[in-house]
């Protein structure tokens, strides 16, 4: 797609701007002015990026030209007569000449005696030689640092084709000494940039490698389960400590005479006493079992959770279900006492109406007979004792209705009132309400039922229709 210039964008229609934004991957459902601004900003950014890329390509091309210039200067230095040079500069090894070549060289020097300016040239070459070799060494070190995959460069040897060097060049005699320079060139020309610089061209990442790395970082299912178990263990042990701290060691209520039969509450029946006796221990034991054997599951059934202050008014109500935080005041349990020594205070209150029924219990109390003597007489109501005992219900607050004013039966006056009402409002007839309709239906059903029963018993002769 051809990207328009910034001036052309002003003449575009809104639909064209939207299509352009969609093609560029921008948000298209904006207002016209905002969309135009966003497109201009995006195009400016793209143009700036392109300019930066071009500058980098130019710099990389110039950096590629530098090694070419160096290699060409080396070639020129090699082409010049180097008869007087017997040793290479820097770390290079000595060049041993064969006697034939030495003789030829002597003959040539005798024939061609170099003039004075040539000596100056030689001195210039000798002076320039070390600087060039130093630059070359630096360049080689850089290449060796950046390109690890490239093998170590073989030792170069300056000289003619018939010179033999000791080392690798002695084995590979056919190799050209200028091969490493080509390798260096290829290092730079392939990437179009120096090895130190990063490429700005966006490449697609290898998602497989990324996913594998992420997957290796993730913990396995077994590790996750172990971590969760440890977490639940700590949580459960903390909750158990809280529950044990919240349980107050309550004192037993002093023994009082039994109230009248009418005032016997649901909580004081023998069955409920048995339930309340067994319940705190059962609750504690279940908590312990859950804490030790099954740590991974949290049980919220026995926990007393108060979310707000709105539940405080229910504290004085004695519910049948005893949570760990709110137990019945009649049960006296101590944490240090064993299971057999748990004594119920309500046993002192209990007397049987007729004969005492023998109940088989695992822990029979022997001191019960001395505290509450069994009598066949009718118990006498004690007002003070009943008033001192806590109530099992919430008492009524506020004004009571006046005593003696009962609701009168107005069914006799209903017809008269209705007639008078209709006389007053004859111009606006009142619609039948639902309550009146219900009463009418109930009356009709009653009459129908009586009629059917009368026909069945032969009291009313069935009308033939």
UniProtKB/Swiss-Prot annotation:
Residues 87-96 have a biased composition (Basic residues). Residues 76-86, 169-179, 432-453 have a biased composition (Basic and acidic residues). It comes from the Eukaryota. InterPro entries: NuSAP. The modification Phosphoserine is found at residues 152, 265, 272, 292, 299, 334, 375, 386. Residues 44-123, 148-207, 252-294, 308-338, 396-454 are annotated as: Disordered. Residues 262-405 are annotated as: Interaction with microtubules. Keywords: Cell cycle, Cell division, Chromosome, Coiled coil, Cytoplasm, Cytoskeleton, DNA-binding, Microtubule, Mitosis, Nucleus, Phosphoprotein, Ubl conjugation. GO terms for biological process: establishment of mitotic spindle localization; mitotic chromosome condensation; mitotic cytokinesis. Ubiquitinated. Ubiquitination by FZR1 may lead to proteasome-dependent degradation of this protein. The modification Phosphothreonine is found at residues 204, 269, 337, 361, 372. One of its GO terms (cellular component) is microtubule. GO terms for molecular function: DNA binding; microtubule binding. A motif (KEN box) lies at residues 407-413. Residues 32-61, 430-457 form a coiled coil. It is found in: Cytoplasm; Nucleus, Nucleolus; Cytoplasm, Cytoskeleton, Spindle; Chromosome. Residues 56-75, 154-166 have a biased composition (Polar residues). Pfam families: NUSAP (PF16006). Interacts with DNA and microtubules. Microtubule bundling is inhibited by IPO7, KPNA2 and KPNB1 while association with DNA is also inhibited by IPO7 and KPNA2. The KEN box is required for the FZR1-dependent degradation of this protein subsequent to ubiquitination. Belongs to the NUSAP family. Microtubule-associated protein with the capacity to bundle and stabilize microtubules. May associate with chromosomes and promote the organization of mitotic spindle microtubules around them. This is Nucleolar and spindle-associated protein 1. It comes from Bos taurus (Bovine). The gene is NUSAP1.
């Amino acid at each position: 797609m051809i990207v328009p210039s910034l001036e052309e964008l002003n003449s575009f229609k809104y639909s064209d701007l939207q299509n352009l934004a969609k093609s560029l991957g921008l948000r298209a459902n904006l207002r016209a002015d905002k969309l135009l601004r966003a497109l201009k900003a995006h195009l400016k950014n793209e143009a700036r990026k392109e300019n930066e890329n071009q500058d980098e390509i130019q710099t990389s091309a110039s950096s590629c030209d530098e090694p070419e210039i160096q290699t060409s200067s080396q070639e020129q230095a090699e082409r010049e007569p180097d008869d007087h040079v017997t040793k290479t500069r820097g770390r290079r090894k000595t060049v041993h000449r064969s006697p034939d070549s030495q003789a030829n060289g002597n003959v040539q020097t005798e024939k061609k005696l170099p003039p004075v300016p040539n000596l100056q040239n030689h001195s210039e070459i000798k002076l320039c030689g070390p600087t060039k070799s130093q630059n070359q060494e630096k360049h080689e070190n850089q290449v060796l640092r950046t390109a690890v995959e490239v093998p170590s460069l073989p030792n170069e040897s300056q000289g003619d084709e018939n010179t033999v060097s000791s080392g690798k060049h002695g084995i590979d005699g056919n190799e050209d000494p200028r091969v490493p320079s080509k390798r260096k060139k290829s290092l730079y020309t392939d990437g179009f940039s120096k090895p130190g610089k990063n490429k700005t061209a966006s490449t697609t990442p290898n998602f497989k490698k990324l996913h594998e790395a992420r997957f290796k970082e993730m913990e396995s299912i077994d590790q996750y389960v172990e971590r969760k178990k440890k977490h639940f263990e700590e949580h459960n042990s903390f909750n158990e400590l809280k529950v044990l701290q919240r349980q107050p060691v309550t004192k037993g209520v002093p023994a009082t005479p039994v109230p009248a039969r009418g005032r016997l509450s649901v909580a004081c029946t023998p069955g409920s006493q048995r339930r309340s006796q067994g319940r705190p221990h059962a609750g504690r034991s279940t908590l312990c079992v859950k804490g030790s054997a099954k740590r991974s599951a949290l049980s919220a059934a026995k926990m007393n959770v108060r979310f707000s202050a709105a539940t405080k008014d229910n504290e004085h109500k004695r519910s049948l279900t005893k949570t760990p935080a709110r137990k019945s005041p009649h049960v006296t349990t101590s944490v240090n006492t064993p299971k057999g020594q748990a004594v119920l205070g309500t046993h002192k209150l209990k007397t049987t109406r007729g004969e005492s029924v023998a109940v088989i219990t695992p822990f029979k109390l022997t001191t019960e007979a001395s505290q509450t003597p069994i009598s066949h007489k009718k118990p006498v109501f004690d007002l003070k004792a009943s008033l001192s005992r806590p109530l099992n219900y919430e008492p009524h607050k506020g004004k009571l209705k006046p005593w003696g004013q009962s609701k009168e039966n107005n069914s006799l006056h209903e017809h008269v009132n209705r007639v008078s009402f209709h006389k007053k409002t004859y111009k606006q007839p009142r619609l039948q309400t639902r309550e009146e309709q219900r009463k009418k239906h109930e009356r009709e059903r009653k009459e129908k039922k009586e009629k059917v029963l009368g026909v069945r018993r032969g009291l009313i002769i069935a009308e033939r229709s």
